[in-house]
């Protein structure tokens, strides 16, 4: 008789940022584009600097590279809930700010469906918006007179996903994520007695892909090499601007804003020896496709290296 065991794997993820009760960032950069992008914010991946591409382990639901799902213990159903806290500090033009933030980061449920077919479902953040700062500028034509503006923002996009991994051969796995991106963002600017509030909301379907080649290279030593790819996807955002004065509040339905989920590609590898795991990722994200309503703001593509080390104590 086949016995299925259930494993609940809660994680409290410690990193380092500050501020609002229900935001996951306090970065002023989150006011641009789709906000601050999230990646690897769950379980073992966060404690290893977010490495994901070449990671596979019997208790790790790797939704960044779904090919890694094929390493899950076939006799268990896994549920994972993650949260995190972080501390951030920013300095600009002689002033500085710091904030401490934290929140739920992911929930997923997964396991083996058939002999070579593994699946996971869940919800995780896609991007965060969370900032608060003030800016003072001298009024043109009135030396010594300054106008102070207050900027704030909350919200972000979430991702509901269905991940599938397939073990093609003993050493080769492929995977695919089917994603539904949804959410809303609120951006506020306050100047004197006037408040301008911009609310944007949208949704889009999206898919990304991964593969892993994995094999033992020595006694109790395993090497995994992986790759991931996500294509550029258009997302249309409903755009409502509300102008509030001392005695009036007027909403305006603006033209929908077109943004893009940026194309990305990543390669990585991991080496597991006994209780130690070493992993390295390279990620390229094409942020240059993002649009900005401010002509002074230009987005640039990003190149990122991640290096992580993990040790499992006795009993794990």
Please tell me what each predicted stretch does.
Residues 55-134:
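Outer-membrane beta-barrel translocator/receptor signature
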Residues 27-52, 70-87:
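Transmembrane beta-strand segments of Gram-negative outer membrane beta-barrel proteins
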Residues 12, 60-69, 191-199:
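Generic detector of contiguous secondary-structure segments
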Residues 6, 11, 53-61:
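Short coil-to-helix leader/linker segments, especially the first N-terminal amphipathic alpha-helix
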Residues 1-25:
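Bacterial Sec-dependent N-terminal signal peptides
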Residues 21-47, 94, 108, 112-316:
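Outer-membrane beta-barrel porins/channels
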Residues 6, 11, 75, 166, ...:
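Generic recognition of cysteine residues
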């Amino acid at each position: 008789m086949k016995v299925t065991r259930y494993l609940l794997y809660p994680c409290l993820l410690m990193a380092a940022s500050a501020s609002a009760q229900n935001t996951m960032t306090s970065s002023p950069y989150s006011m641009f584009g789709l906000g601050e992008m999230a990646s690897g914010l769950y379980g073992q991946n966060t404690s290893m600097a977010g490495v994901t591409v070449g990671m596979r382990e019997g208790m790790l639901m790797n939704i960044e590279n779904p090919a890694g799902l094929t390493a899950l213990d076939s006799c268990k159903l896994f549920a994972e809930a993650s949260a995190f806290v972080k501390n951030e500090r920013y300095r600009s033009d002689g002033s500085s700010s710091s904030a401490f933030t934290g929140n739920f980061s992911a929930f997923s449920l997964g396991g083996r469906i058939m002999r070579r077919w593994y699946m996971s479902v869940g919800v995780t953040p896609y991007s965060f918006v969370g900032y608060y700062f003030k800016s003072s500028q001298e009024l043109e034509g009135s030396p010594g007179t300054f106008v102070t503006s207050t900027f704030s923002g909350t919200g972000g996009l979430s991702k509901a996903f269905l991940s599938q991994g397939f073990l093609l051969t003993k050493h080769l796995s492929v995977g695919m994520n089917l994603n539904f991106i949804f959410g809303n963002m609120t951006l506020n600017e306050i100047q004197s007695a006037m408040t301008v509030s911009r609310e944007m909301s949208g949704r889009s379907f999206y898919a990304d892909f991964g593969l892993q080649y994995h094999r033992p290279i020595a006694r109790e030593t395993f090497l995994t090499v992986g790759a991931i790819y996500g294509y550029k996807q258009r997302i249309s955002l409903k755009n409502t601007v509300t102008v509030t004065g001392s005695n009036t509040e007027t909403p305006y339905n603006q033209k929908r804003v077109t943004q893009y989920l940026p194309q990305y590609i990543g390669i990585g590898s991991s080496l597991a020896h006994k209780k130690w795991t070493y992993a390295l990722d390279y990620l390229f994200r094409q942020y240059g496709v993002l649009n900005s309503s401010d002509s002074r703001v230009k987005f640039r593509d990003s190149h990122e290296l991640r290096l992580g080390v993990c040790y499992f104590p006795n009993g794990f």
